[in-house]
């Protein structure tokens, strides 16, 4: 009998070990409207830790006071087999946004996502350049999982049998409301680690949630003023003379140009890289950079971080690199201080000290076929998947610190990022080239604290060329990337004048763009964002399918898809931009509540309604809120220098009174962090 008791006790203990222990989460407030909870034992290596975030505390004071969201008490976590699962409740008709840089969808409820840094492959499945594990609810809260692992997210997919909202079984033979995706009342997230750190953000609005996230991550980047001008990336094997001639041609043709990007041929070896100048194409790098600066044009350098055996730092870097190579180049273990210092010193010595203004850091995302495998090891002890998830953060942080210590701002490009990168001076790009999907990515970037450029590379027609250019001037970085095509703004002579008009418009609007990035930094408001964050926006007006025949209570995902607006967005405080794509003659635009006016003519266009417009080839639809005040400067070819005065033209739209806060600082240094900046109130009564 005693032996039987022992067996029973042992059996009970085994069952307890097999069954995951579920528990509510204790929440600790870390910033106003932001709470942190812990399940199990989270790994020390995390996204926010790698990003080295310092919250922008002053910005929180300008947000509404809030209390812990009620759903906090319903969030549960459990640990089984060394993995952590989290369950966050959902309400009917609640919509989800975010989960990183998606290219084809804005609404994420109903998705199954594997959040994994990778080059985007044409499907919104979680594998993307910035798989940020942060989402925003239409109910006015947000959730961030601070883990550097590959996460699996069931964003309202999967129904528990013990749920009080469990769907009812239906007979597919006879019931037309049967669906293959029954109603799910929760987001479930699997973290492959024995613990997880979860952040909960209160609103009350979705925009407030986004702002709190951005402020927690240090506030948005404030680029140098020249970074908001126009940039051209040259062909791969251009020489110093080729670059100078191209800059001269921009000047002669009257096209603006603030910085030029040099592609792989500037290096003595690339793929993998030496980080050293090619002596035949650039015999005098310092003189070349100096000459370009004298023309008012800065230099940005392409690179990837993989070290060639021919690089002078190869031997020193070898012991602090990973076990596997990329294109036969070693991979610096940037999680280790020594590898970072070796790389930083090399970049500083070869580039920054002679006046190079920034970097384009390529191929830190994937593809799997060439990047290190998940079996790779690194001297720091960081797992290969964690390094994959954070390598984009490391290259941004490392290069940004190079300029920060010189009190010099930079603005560049990167192909991978993740949570915590909001304050880094980098814009994401890729090798994909769908114009409509590029706009959807621009829309989604505002949910995740990253920036994206719908860059122009090449086109098969003058129409496509112009349409892409019209879009890119209303984005974080106005750029032609001609590394392979050799295209220039005037490549299609039949639309050269229209291209020039939009290029000059970009320059004229620099006071507006600069002020909007200041709001991004100080207040966390993304300068380019989805309509879903705009007050008074009603996606019902964007319905593209009849819903009367659908049982939306059982299939809310159908409702979400039918109301998705993914081809128009807000640019700054006042502008609604609706791009046109090749072959389009007309399009619909959904206007939020309030009077809206045509950006070009000032004419009234509508209020809280869906309109159909036929703008012609010379224009894309851009609309302005009633009462808006927009600051313009005179058209010019280069951004103003520090201390340079410019004449402003102030435009007021509509009939309502309005105001605008115009931001100013030296445009080049970090002195604004010490209070060296000003806001000027522009008021129309």
What annotation goes with each model-predicted range?
Residues 19-23:
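Sec/Tat signal peptide C-region and signal peptidase I cleavage site
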Residues 24-618, 664-669:
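Catalytic-domain carbohydrate-binding cleft regions of carbohydrate-active enzymes
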Residues 10-17:
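Bacterial N-terminal signal peptides
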Residues 2, 143, 212-214, 317, ...:
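Generic hydrophobic, helix-prone segments enriched in Leu/Val/Ile
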Residues 1-7:
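Positively charged n-region of N-terminal signal peptides that target proteins for export
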Residues 624-682:
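Accessory, solvent-exposed terminal regions and/or long lumenal/extracellular loops of proteins
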């Amino acid at each position: 009998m005693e032996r039987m008791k022992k067996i029973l006790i042992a059996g009970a203990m085994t069952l307890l070990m097999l069954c995951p222990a579920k528990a509510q989460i204790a929440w600790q407030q870390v910033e106003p409207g932001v709470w942190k909870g812990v399940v199990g034992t989270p790994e020390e290596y995390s996204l926010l830790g790698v990003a080295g975030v310092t919250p922008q505390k002053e910005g929180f004071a300008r947000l509404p006071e809030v209390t812990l969201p009620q759903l906090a008490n319903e969030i549960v976590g459990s640990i089984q087999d060394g993995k952590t699962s989290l369950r966050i409740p959902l309400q009917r008709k609640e919509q989800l946004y975010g989960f990183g840089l998606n290219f084809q969808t804005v609404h994420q409820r109903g998705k199954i996502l594997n959040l994994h840094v990778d080059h985007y492959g044409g499907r919104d499945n979680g594998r993307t350049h910035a798989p940020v594990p942060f989402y925003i609810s239409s109910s006015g809260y947000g959730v961030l999982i601070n883990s550097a692992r590959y996460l699996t997210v069931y964003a309202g997919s999967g129904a528990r049998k013990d749920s009080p909202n469990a769907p009812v079984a239906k007979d597919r033979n006879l019931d037309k409301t049967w669906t293959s995706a029954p109603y799910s009342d929760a987001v479930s997230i699997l973290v492959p680690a024995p613990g997880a750190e979860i952040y909960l953000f209160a609103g009350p609005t979705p925009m407030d949630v986004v702002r709190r996230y951005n402020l927690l991550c240090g506030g948005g980047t404030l680029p140098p003023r020249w970074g908001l001008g126009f940039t051209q990336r040259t062909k791969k094997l251009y020489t110093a003379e080729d670059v100078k001639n191209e800059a001269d041609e921009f000047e002669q043709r009257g096209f603006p140009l603030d910085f030029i990007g040099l592609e792989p041929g500037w290096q003595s070896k690339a793929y993998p890289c030496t980080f050293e100048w090619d002596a035949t194409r650039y015999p005098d790098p310092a003189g070349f950079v100096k000459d370009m600066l004298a023309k008012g044009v800065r230099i940005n350098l392409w690179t990837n971080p993989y070290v060639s055996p021919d690089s002078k730092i190869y031997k020193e870097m070898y012991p602090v690199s990973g076990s596997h190579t990329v294109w036969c180049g070693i991979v610096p273990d940037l999680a280790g201080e020594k590898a970072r210092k070796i790389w930083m010193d090399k970049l500083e010595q070869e580039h920054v000290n002679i006046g190079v203004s920034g970097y384009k850091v390529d191929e830190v995302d994937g593809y799997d076929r060439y990047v290190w495998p998940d079996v790779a090891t690194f001297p720091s002890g960081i797992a290969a998947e964690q390094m994959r998830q954070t390598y984009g953060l490391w290259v941004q942080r490392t290069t940004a610190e190079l300029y920060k210590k010189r009190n010099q701002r930079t603005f560049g490009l990167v192909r991978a990022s993740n949570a915590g990168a909001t304050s880094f001076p980098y814009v994401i790009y890729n090798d994909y080239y769908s114009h409509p999907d590029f706009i959807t990515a621009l829309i989604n970037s505002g949910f995740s604290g990253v920036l994206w450029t719908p860059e122009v590379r090449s086109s098969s027609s003058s129409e496509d060329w112009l349409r892409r250019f019209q879009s890119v001037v209303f984005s974080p970085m106005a750029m032609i990337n001609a590394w392979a095509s050799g295209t220039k703004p005037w490549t299609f002579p039949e639309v050269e004048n229209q291209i020039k008009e939009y290029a000059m418009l970009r320059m004229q609007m620099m006071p507006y763009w600069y002020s909007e990035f200041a709001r991004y930094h100080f207040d966390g408001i993304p300068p380019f964002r989805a309509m879903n964050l705009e007050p008074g926006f009603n996606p019902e007006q964007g319905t593209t399918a009849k819903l009367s025949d659908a049982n939306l209570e059982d299939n809310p995902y159908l409702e979400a898809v039918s109301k998705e607006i993914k081809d128009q967005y807000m640019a700054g405080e006042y502008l609604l931009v609706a791009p046109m794509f090749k072959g389009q003659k007309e399009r619909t635009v959904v206007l939020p509540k309030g009077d809206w006016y045509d950006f070009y003519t000032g004419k009234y266009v509508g209020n809280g309604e869906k309109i159909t417009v036929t703008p012609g080839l010379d224009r894309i639809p851009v609309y302005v809120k009633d009462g808006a005040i927009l600051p313009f400067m005179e058209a010019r070819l280069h951004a103003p220098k520090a201390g340079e005065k410019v004449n402003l033209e102030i435009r007021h739209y509509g009939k309502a009174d309005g105001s605008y806060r115009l931001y100013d600082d030296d445009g080049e240094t970090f002195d604004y962090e010490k209070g060296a900046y000003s806001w000027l109130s522009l008021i129309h009564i």
